UniProtKB/Swiss-Prot annotation:
Pfam families from the UniProt entry: LRR_1, LRR_14, LRR_8
Underlying gene: RLP42
Protein name: Receptor-like protein 42
Gene inactivation effect: Impaired perception of fungal endopolygalacturonases (e.g. BcPG3) leading to absence of necrosis upon B.cinerea BcPG3, BcPG2, BcPG4, and BcPG6 or A.niger AnPGB treatments.
Coiled coil: none
Organism in which the protein naturally occurs: Arabidopsis thaliana (Mouse-ear cress)
């Protein structure tokens, strides 16, 4: 836990201790004890509990319960953490507790409730926490009635708007609104700057902006913690920041600040200075290294230059964490050697003009972490004769042009984490590496290694939990994995033979990725208990094991591009956590798996290039299920039938759009040791906009559909226009008839549209010319007629996108439309009516068959997607919350 979080927790507890004399009662028994709650209060509390699902509540949690005033019996404090699931309604019994002084409801699931204005009635509140509880929309202005508040925590919700609700909250000492969507300009006259008693202010991860950090922050001179990380502030940090003489922690990272480093020399109590990821320039003042309590400096990823000077007096410095990577610093190594108390040192990507000798760090006897990635390392200092601190636990030497395995690692018996990716290391992994007693994580991807010294059992007794060996030249049989293995990835190597059955005995294995190798044989049935199984692009045969039992934890399953046959296992329906399913490019012969609609979290379904057959429309001819599905790729099968107009109405997740930075990624995160954890992201290979590309981090706020190369017929469903998150649509090479739906003009995010090789008729809707993101469009080889719309995005398409339609005319085709002076073709009546209605499509209209007889054609990109899931692995050290995002990610 970070110092700032510890401080916040301490402050909340301190404020809670100020509540009047009271008695505490458990969640289930508010009536027990000598000072029991009044009968009306008991009734209100019981009603409040009954408004929610409380099955997740930990009734043994000593902090969950009710405090009642000993003299009046009134509820004065209520804390229910991670207990409640449901909607917090304005008529909730909660608002009957008018004597509440402390209300703590963090980590509940209020299912996207808005914060009720009724909170303003609880005007005796001194402490209020609603963090991590799913609240959305704006904070009601009635919050300004809570004039007694000393602490307010609204962090980690989906709240929007400004901070106008803090007006009149003049007693506030703690304000945390981090991890929301608050926005707007922080003006000098903002109510925020009237909160002169604030000692803790956290605005992290919002979208506040200002041409510079307001000078008025300097008026909050009681502040001890100030955090404005990851907003949209730019310009220079005002000199008034030096007025905050009580400040102990200052967080300004991930903004667009410029100019010199802020003046912090007067902040003699400062212990943490975090300025990562800005555009600060100039030199680093030597005074930073003599500040009496400063223990952590994060200046990485800026534009700092020059050398640094470390006074001799710095040997007594408390500095433990120094991050200077990705700057333009010159002579810094010898001065840094004076900072003998350093525990973490980042000097990555400094572009030094001379090689770095690791022995320069020999004086740093307490060093635990060293990152020299992207630097030029002296070859001699990597030998066994070199000396570097034996205390090292984490060593990163990526992108260092190293060609031999560093023997100096032999002496590092405390080493837990090694990163040597993107070098030129060849030969075999040395046998001694796996004998390092504390080695837990090894990342040696993108090298030239060919195998392992020793027998096939060489890894078995290693302590390694995380092993990533992607993109080497490893060949032969896969060695037996460590007994402690949690994550193993060997993507893009030359391993062959059967997948060893010894993997079945690795009970802690969560993630196995053997994609892009030469494995053959069958998939071992025992792999059904993994969280992530990736076997893409091998030579595996047989059927997929039908061994998935109830509550199987599987989240991602990819066996695409193999030689698998048989049917899709019905037991997959037991995988309630499944998000990503890919069996594309195999020989699976089955009907469409409608039963998978029961999987509540399924977001990606890839079935292309198999032998799926039969109707794609559900047996009842109603809408297709899959409310969370965003990517559906079933191209190149033998699916038949027509699709009803309301086919896509249940795709709720794809009907909403969000800004890219607010999207959710296909991601898995797991603590691996101590304060370290790994994060895995999905990536996919697309043929997109006519080009092959890799999309890293599958953003599930976007949607793509590819139904091409089947035998589908009838009209294109009007309900496609509901899928506002759709960026790519491919319906080519089918037998669709009728007109292109006008509703496609509602797809404002669409980038790629392919309707080629169908039997579509009518004109191309003019509305498609207004789609500003449409970069690729193909409607060739249909029966379209009339003039091609002249919108910018359409006229930029090649002639081949419109060929094969005898009745089409206009640019970019050579055929003119009835002569240069002839009037344009008359619009169909339905298109005129749709334009009058501004082409708005709603759910009700689709459900009753909106636009009966409104048939116009459709168009989408070549999303013949060959999905190549890989893992992007980033190690993050979360000693404070910011390190969760900055620690080792560049």
């Amino acid at each position: 836990m970070s110092k700032s979080l510890l401080r916040l927790t301490f402050l909340l507890l301190l404020l809670l201790s100020c509540v009047s004399p009271s008695s505490f009662f458990t969640f289930n028994n508010p009536a027990e004890g000598p000072g029991a709650c009044g009968p009306h209060q008991i009734q209100a509390f019981t009603q409040f509990k009954n408004e929610f699902d409380t099955r997740a509540c930990n009734h043994s949690d000593p902090w969950n319960g009710v405090w009642c005033d000993n003299s009046t019996g009134a509820v004065t404090m209520l804390q229910l953490r991670a207990c409640l699931s449901g909607t917090l309604k304005p008529n909730s019994s909660l608002f009957q507790f008018h004597h509440l002084r402390s209300l703590l409801l963090p980590h509940n699931n209020f299912t996207s409730s808005s914060i009720s204005s009724k909170f303003g009635m609880l005007n005796n509140l001194e402490v209020l926490s609603l963090s991590s509880s799913g609240f959305l929309a704006q904070v009601p202005f009635s919050f300004s009635n809570l004039s007694m508040l000393s602490a307010l925590d609204l962090s980690k919700n989906e709240l929007t708007g400004s901070l106008s609700f803090v007006r009149n909250l003049r007693k506030l000492r703690v304000l945390d609104v981090s991890y929301n969507h608050f926005s707007g300009i922080l003006n000098p006259n903002s109510s925020l700057f009237e909160l002169h008693h604030l000692i803790y202010l956290n605005l992290r991860y919002n979208n506040f902006t200002s041409s510079s950090l307001p000078y008025e922050f300097g008026n909050l001179n009681k502040l001890e913690v100030l955090d404005v990380s990851s907003n949209s502030f730019f310009g220079q940090v005002p000199p008034t920041i030096s007025n905050l003489t009580q400040l102990t922690e200052l967080y300004l990272p991930l903004n667009d600040f410029t100019g010199s480093l802020p003046l912090v020399q007067n902040l003699t109590k400062l212990s943490i200075l975090h300025l990562f990821g800005n555009h600060f320039s100039g030199t680093i003042p030597s005074s930073l290294f003599t500040m009496p309590f400063l223990s952590s400096i994060y200046l990485n990823k800026n534009n700092l230059s020059g050398s640094i000077e470390v006074p001799n007096s710095s040997s007594s410095s408390r500095l433990e964490h120094l991050y200077l990577g990705k700057n333009h610093l010159g002579k810094i190594l010898e001065p840094i050697a004076k900072l003998v108390n350093l525990k973490e040192l980042d000097l990555s990507f400094l572009n030094t003009s001379h090689p770095i000798d690791l022995s320069l760090f020999s004086s740093l006897k307490s060093l635990l972490l060293l990152d020299l990635s992207g630097d030029w390392i002296s070859k001699a200092s990597l030998t066994l004769d070199s000396y570097i601190p034996s205390t090292l636990e984490v060593l990163r030497l990526e992108h260092c042009d190293i060609s031999e395995f560093p023997n100096v690692f032999k002496t590092l018996h405390n080493l837990e984490y090694i990163a040597l990716s993107n070098n030129r290391i060849s030969g075999k992994f040395p046998e001694w590496l796996w004998s390092l007693p504390r080695l837990s994580s090894v990342f040696i991807t993108d090298n030239l290694l060919t195998g392992f010294e020793g027998s096939s059992e060489v890894l078995v007794n290693s302590s390694v939990q995380i092993l990533s060996l992607d993109t080497n030249s490893l060949e032969g049989a896969l060695p037996h994995l460590p007994l402690s293995i949690n994550y193993f990835s060997a993507i893009d190597n030359r391993f062959g033979g059967d997948i060893p059955l010894s993997i079945c005995n690795r009970s802690s294995l969560d993630v196995l990725d053997l994609s892009y190798n030469n494995f053959s044989g069958q998939i071992p049935p025992c792999l059904s208990n993994l969280l992530y199984l990736k076997l893409r692009k091998n030579n595996l045969e047989g059927s997929i094991p039908d061994k998935y039992y109830v509550d199987t934890p599987l989240r991602s399953f990819d066996v695409g591009y193999n030689r698998l046959t048989g049917k899709l296992p019905r037991s997959l329906i037991n995988c309630s956590a499944l998000q990503f399913l890919s069996v594309d490019h195999n020989g699976i012969k089955d009907t469409f798996p409608f039963y998978l609609k029961a999987l509540p979290k399924l977001q990606v379904l890839l079935l292309s290039s198999n032998e799926f057959y039969g109707p794609l429309s559900p047996p009842n001819q109603g809408p297709l299920g899959f409310p969370e599905l965003r990517i559906l790729e079933i191209a190149g099968n033998k699916l038949t039938g027509s699709l009803p107009p309301d086919f896509f109405v249940n795709w709720k997740a794809s009907s909403h759009t969000m800004n890219e930075d607010l999207g959710l990624y296909m991601v898995y995160s797991k603590v691996i040791f101590g304060n370290y954890h790994l994060t895995y992201y999905e990536t996919i290979d697309l043929r997109y906009k006519g080009l092959s590309m890799e999309q890293e981090n599958v953003l599930t706020s976007s949607a793509t559909i590819d139904l091409s190369g089947n035998r589908l017929e009838g009209e294109i469903p009007e309900s496609l226009g509901l899928l506002k998150a759709l960026i790519a649509l491919n319906l080519s090479n089918n037998a669709f008839t009728g007109h292109i739906p006008l509703s496609l003009a509602n797809l404002k995010k669409i980038e790629s549209l392919d309707l080629s090789s169908n039997q579509l008729s009518g004109t191309i809707p003019n509305g498609l010319g207004t789609l500003s993101f449409l970069a690729y469009m193909n409607v060739s080889h249909n029966q379209l007629n009339g003039e091609i719309p002249q919108g910018t995005q359409i006229t930029g398409q090649p002639k081949s996108s419109f060929e094969g339609n005898a009745g089409l005319c206009g640019f970019p085709l050579q055929e003119s439309c009835f002569g240069t002076n002839a009037p344009p073709a008359q619009k169909p009546k339905e298109e005129e009516e749709a334009e009058e209605d501004e082409q708005e499509l709603n759910w009700k209209a689709v459900a009753i068959g909106y636009g009966v007889g409104v048939l116009l054609g459709l168009a989408i990109a070549q999303l013949i997607a060959s999905y190549k899931p890989e893992w992007l692995v980033c190690l993050v050290k979360s000693r404070n919350p910011l390190r969760s995002f900055f620690g080792f990610e560049y």
